[in-house]
């Protein structure tokens, strides 16, 4: 029995959008005890202060529903030293993915236009398909994957999209769109909600948040998380920043207690330990310089952007190399079925020691043949 027959034999039937869509599933199993350079996570884990805060959670905290005011207050006052936020301009979510899904649930309409780039983070597409939206994409330009700003402007004016998603820096190309360019895009059509996914922003330091005034620019939402820098990917904590009325509508489609008490406690401890995050980001950026210098003289294509990852087009079949790297203790991500970057692998950047291990292994497997 094929998938179509299986669905037709179901009672009740799921929505037709669900039947027709492909699920987003990342191959994240059996990754323990390996050097994880495949999903752009923090490769060291959270700070000692996070461990201590979680260890000190008492049973009473587990048995009652989580409270968010303390974390929201801290984020309001200390997330960026250069500015403060109104607590109503902040949404807390069970990871950035939950924030993305909630935005589509609250603003995505059937047959409305969803505009994004290609290639980009794969979770945007299924979220738009669930809502029955029409997806339009702009392709990155040239070998350096420059942002297609002119294409984007033309499509905003022509199609007046309901939702626009820009991953900035983009995953997987690392392309960066500057803050002033984003604000200009928002001004082209104020009925378009522009969502800026800034999960990797700390690695290049060009966030909208220090400069944007949500009272003046109401059609921008900024998403961040603590997965890539603070090492909290397993606890799932994400933030959405925007005009208070926009955040209020997004919150309507989430559960009242979606973020658990462990995540709240860990997030507060991580945000208070800013030096740990700063030191980790600094170490990753030093490791980027190290691996860039190693790869520079090689006659193979490679691309570094603004995130904690890079692309490389190996001599070997990327599927074979990915498997062999795993057999040697290192996970990397094959970029199959992704426009303009097929036959490449994406490599997360860890510490200098970790990238030296990557280099030794990669050289042995792909260059010494």
Which stretches of residues belong to each language-model region?
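N-terminal small-domain helix-loop-helix segment of the aminotransferase-like
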Residues: 2-95, 102, 369
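Conserved core of the PLP fold type I
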Residues: 59-189, 200-217, 221
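Short acidic/glycine-enriched loop/turn segments that link adjacent beta-strands
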Residues: 71-72, 234, 306-307, 339-343
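PLP-dependent aminotransferase class I/II
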Residues: 219-295, 300-303
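Short beta-strand-to-loop capping motifs
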Residues: 242, 312-316, 349-351
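Conserved PLP-binding catalytic core of the aspartate aminotransferase-like
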Residues: 285, 297-328
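PLP-dependent enzyme catalytic core of the Aspartate aminotransferase-like
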Residues: 327-328, 337-369
């Amino acid at each position: 029995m094929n998938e179509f027959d299986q669905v037709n034999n179901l009672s009740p039937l799921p929505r037709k959008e669900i039947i027709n869509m492909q699920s987003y599933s990342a191959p994240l199993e059996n990754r323990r005890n390996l050097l994880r350079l495949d999903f752009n996570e923090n490769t060291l884990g959270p700070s000692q202060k996070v461990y201590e805060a979680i260890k000190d959670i008492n049973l009473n905290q587990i048995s009652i529903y989580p409270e968010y005011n303390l974390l929201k207050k801290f984020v309001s006052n200390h997330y960026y030293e250069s500015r403060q936020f109104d607590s109503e301009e902040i949404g807390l979510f069970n990871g950035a993915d939950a924030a993305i899904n909630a935005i589509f649930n609250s603003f995505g309409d059937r047959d409305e236009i969803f505009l994004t780039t290609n290639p980009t983070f794969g979770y945007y597409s299924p979220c738009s398909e669930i809502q029955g939206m029409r997806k339009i994409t702009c392709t990155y330009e040239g070998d350096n994957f420059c942002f297609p700003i002119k294409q984007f402007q033309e499509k905003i004016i022509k199609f007046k999209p309901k939702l626009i998603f820009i991953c900035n820096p983009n995953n997987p190309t690392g392309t960066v769109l500057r803050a002033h360019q984003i604000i200009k895009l928002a001004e082209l059509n104020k009925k378009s909600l522009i969502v800026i996914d800034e999960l990797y922003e700390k690695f290049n330091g060009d966030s909208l948040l220090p400069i944007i005034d949500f009272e003046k620019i109401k059609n921008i939402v900024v998403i961040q998380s603590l997965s890539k820098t603070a090492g909290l990917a397993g606890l799932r904590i994400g933030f959405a920043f925007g005009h208070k009325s926009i955040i209020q509508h997004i919150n309507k489609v989430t559960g009242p207690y979606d973020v658990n008490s462990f995540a709240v406690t860990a997030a507060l401890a991580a945000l208070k330990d800013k030096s740990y995050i700063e030191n980790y980001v600094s170490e990753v950026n030093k490791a980027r310089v190290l691996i860039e210098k190693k790869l520079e003289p090689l006659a193979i294509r490679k691309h570094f952007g603004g995130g904690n990852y890079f692309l490389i087009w190996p001599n070997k079949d990327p599927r074979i190399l990915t498997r062999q790297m795993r057999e040697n203790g290192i996970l990397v991500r094959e970029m199959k079925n992704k426009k303009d970057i097929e036959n490449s692998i994406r490599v997360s950047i860890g510490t200098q020691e970790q990238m030296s291990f990557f280099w030794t292994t990669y050289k042995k497997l792909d260059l010494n043949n």
